[in-house]
Regions:
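Helix N-cap at the start of a conserved alpha-helix in ABC-type nucleotide-binding domains
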Residues: 120-122
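Catalytic Walker B motif of ABC-type/P-loop ATPase nucleotide-binding domains
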Residues: 109-112
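Conserved ABC ATPase "signature" region
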Residues: 48, 62-80
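Conserved ABC ATPase signature
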Residues: 84-88, 92
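H-loop/switch region of ABC-family ATPase nucleotide-binding domains
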Residues: 144-145
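ABC ATPase nucleotide-binding domains
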Residues: 175-176, 181-218
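Helix-to-loop junction immediately C-terminal to a conserved catalytic motif
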Residues: 8
């Protein structure tokens, strides 16, 4: 979260610097846990608020309403424009803030833990949506701790722990040495269905047998 804030210019880096291209339009999709979903706005109003900053009369114009409808339709939410944001599912909540970012004509979108708290199916839906947006030319930068559900499916992965530990394709970065230096504990990488799966490495005598009900050990 702090890294994204530094890249967006909302906090100053303690060291180093951030260079931003002049005229580059960026958008942020925050963690869903940081949003007050009881705030009294509809989906369309929430999206329209993205352009309200610095506007004396922040009312949605007829043209903007049409643009909002187009953005929501692109994300498969055309029928939800008048629904209150608290009535949305986790995946729909993520799409609302993606719509906000797209409504500002962002060229780069930053997402903070976009799959946090989502079930497996919804997580895959969000991932496929991001992949489609990226294929359409949108640059996407996201943070995640979900190595198996998200990181292994990304085209480029960067592991950070006070500095860059590794950067490259998932098969280059998701390796035991890089992961151990990133997380500070032993990790193992397995192959399953052509994909890399990261698991905690056993710690010798600290590993206890899993007991099933009835007293049998696994």
């Amino acid at each position: 979260s702090t890294l994204l804030k530094a890249m967006l210019g909302t906090v100053s880096p303690v060291s180093g610097s951030v260079r931003r291209m002049q005229g580059l339009a960026v958008g942020l999709v925050p963690q869903v846990e940081t949003i007050d979903w009881n705030f009294p706005v509809t989906v369309a109003e929430c999206v329209g608020m993205a352009r309200a900053r610095g506007v004396r009369m922040p009312w949605i114009t007829k043209r903007e309403r049409a643009e909002i409808g187009s953005v929501l339709d692109r994300l498969g939410m055309a029928e939800l424009g008048r629904r209150h944001i608290r009535e949305l599912s986790g995946g729909q909540q993520q799409r609302v803030f993606l719509a906000r970012a797209l409504f500002t004509n962002a060229q780069v979108i930053f997402l903070d833990e976009p799959t946090s708290g989502l079930d497996v199916r919804t997580r895959h839906d969000v991932l496929h949506l991001l992949d489609d947006l990226n294929a359409d030319g949108l640059t996407i930068v996201l943070t995640t701790h979900d190595l198996n559900g998200i990181a292994a499916h990304l085209p480029t992965v960067v592991c950070l722990n006070r500095s860059v530990i590794g950067a490259g394709r998932p098969d280059e970065v998701l390796v035991p040495d890089v992961l151990e230096r990133t997380y500070g504990s032993p990790m193992e990488v397995l192959e399953h269905g052509g994909m890399r799966v990261v698991v905690d490495a056993p710690l010798g005598d600290n590993v206890l047998p899993l007991r099933r009900s009835g007293g049998a050990s696994a």
